[in-house]
């Protein structure tokens, strides 16, 4: 076989294997092409895409840059380079790539959509809105476009009509692609934001029928009052929810929901931490043994690290723990159910901090008793909660899927667990559907 024919055959075999997900087969075939012709633009391009899929993003960028120097008018290559930058949060570089792709191919579907997404990530909200509208104007039957624009409208509502418009986009996305069940989750939450709870329950009922093993729609049906509310969110629900949410958790919570529980907890602990540092100057051992209980992606870690001798984190979601490992700062991270973990570690910590975790527990008696036992004498527990309005008693599962607690109930269960010096500060710690949610932070001490 002559060289040109052998090269063409190897490239075709590589591309076929690549499309079929056979990366181990495709990579050496692309490299064979490049051995025959070291400046082959398609082999450079597609090998770059493959290396990105394998987590070798820096090498991928080099190969795509080489490909684009050879074929600068290749819209797909510009778009794929933009995708790599986007996934590494280099949003300005991604924007430039997508704009070059669209200058060459104004209807390029992936570049249209991803330009809108990176403009949103860059917090250029008005430009992002226009980009989403342009995407759907050019591709009105794109289910992904309807879903993403609906998500954008819920995250950046200018008025109630935006959320109502989001509902229509979610319905449109599902009509175009009924296999995308994540659309039903977004639709249910949008309807909750509009206080159309019965409609939200109908959506969750439909979702539960389509995906009977998924715990999320079952939990949300209970949250809407259409099934009995559990005493706490099930382990399977928490894992499913947060494993799927881990990669975008920080951006969604901090940017879109105004999440500020970590700093509020540090603020409420300020007198305790100041007293500890004063004691260190008088000869006490430096630092505290601290547990971040329900640590998630580790948002509390940087705030706690400066005060810790040893900083541990525990979470039920392995996906969230992966993000916490990438963030760093913890001496130990453990995948476990929180109450059982605390029960297994008596008198192990000087301070336990729990941000946005008790909202997945209705009844708090067992958890607070376990936290009390896991503290050393004189240790403190600080946590955030969402609260019921006024003098409402007990606890309730809200249509958001999160539990809210009455102030009197919190006081009673803390006292019952043996805590003293309970201090509560009312604070709105996050938004939902554009509105601040009533909540607060609590500091309590285990007596000597």
PLM feature spans:
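A short glycine-rich, Lys/Arg-flanked "PGG" loop and its adjoining helix->strand segment in the class I
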Residues: 365-377
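Conserved alpha-helical positions within TPR/SEL1-like repeat arrays
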Residues: 11-19, 42-53, 76-87, 110-121, ...
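A conserved beta-strand element that flanks and buttresses the S-adenosyl-L-methionine
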Residues: 353
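Class I SAM-dependent methyltransferase SAM/SAH-binding core
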Residues: 291, 295-341
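Short, glycine-/aromatic-enriched active-site segment of Class I SAM-dependent methyltransferases
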Residues: 383-403
């Amino acid at each position: 076989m002559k060289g040109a024919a052998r090269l063409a055959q190897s490239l075709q075999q590589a591309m076929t294997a690549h499309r079929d997900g056979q990366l181990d087969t495709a990579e050496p075939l692309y490299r064979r092409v490049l051995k025959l012709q070291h400046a082959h633009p398609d082999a450079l391009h597609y090998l770059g895409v493959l290396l990105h899929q394998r987590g070798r993003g820096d090498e991928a960028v080099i190969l795509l840059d080489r490909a684009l120097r050879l074929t600068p008018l290749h819209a797909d290559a510009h778009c794929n380079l933009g995708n790599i930058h986007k996934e590494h949060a280099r949003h300005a570089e991604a924007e430039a790539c997508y704009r070059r792709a669209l200058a060459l191919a104004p209807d390029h579907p992936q570049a249209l959509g991803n330009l809108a997404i990176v403009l949103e990530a860059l917090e250029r909200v008005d430009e992002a809105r226009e980009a989403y509208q342009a995407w759907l104007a050019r591709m009105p039957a794109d289910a992904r476009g309807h879903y993403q624009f609906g998500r954008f409208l819920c995250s950046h509502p200018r008025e109630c009509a935006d959320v109502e418009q989001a509902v229509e986009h979610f319905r449109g996305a599902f009509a175009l692609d009924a296999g995308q069940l994540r659309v039903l989750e977004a639709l249910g939450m949008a309807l909750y934001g509009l206080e159309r709870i019965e409609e939200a329950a109908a959506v969750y009922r439909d979702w539960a029928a389509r995906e009977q093993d998924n715990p999320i729609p079952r939990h949300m049906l209970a949250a809407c009052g259409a099934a009995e509310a559990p005493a706490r969110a099930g382990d399977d629900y928490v894992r499913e929810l947060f494993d799927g949410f881990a990669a975008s958790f920080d951006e969604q919570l901090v940017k879109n929901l105004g999440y500020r529980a970590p700093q509020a907890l540090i603020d409420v602990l300020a007198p305790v931490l100041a007293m500890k540092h004063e004691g260190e100057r008088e000869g006490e051992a430096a630092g505290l043994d601290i547990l971040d209980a329900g640590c998630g992606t580790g948002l509390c870690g940087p705030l706690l690290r400066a005060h810790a001798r040893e900083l541990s984190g525990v979470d039920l979601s392995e996906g969230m723990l992966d993000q916490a490992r990438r963030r760093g700062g913890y001496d130990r991270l453990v995948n476990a159910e929180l109450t059982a973990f605390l029960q297994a570690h008596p008198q192990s910590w000087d301070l336990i901090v729990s941000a946005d975790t008790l909202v997945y527990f209705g009844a708090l008696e067992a958890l607070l008793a376990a936290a009390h036992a896991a503290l050393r004498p004189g240790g403190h527990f600080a946590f955030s909660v969402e609260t019921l309005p006024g003098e409402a008693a007990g606890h309730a599962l809200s249509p958001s899927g999160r539990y809210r607690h009455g102030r009197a109930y919190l006081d009673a269960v803390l006292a019952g667990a043996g805590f003293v010096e309970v201090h509560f500060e009312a604070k709105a710690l996050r938004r939902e559907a554009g509105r601040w949610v009533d909540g607060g932070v609590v500091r309590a001490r285990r007596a000597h």
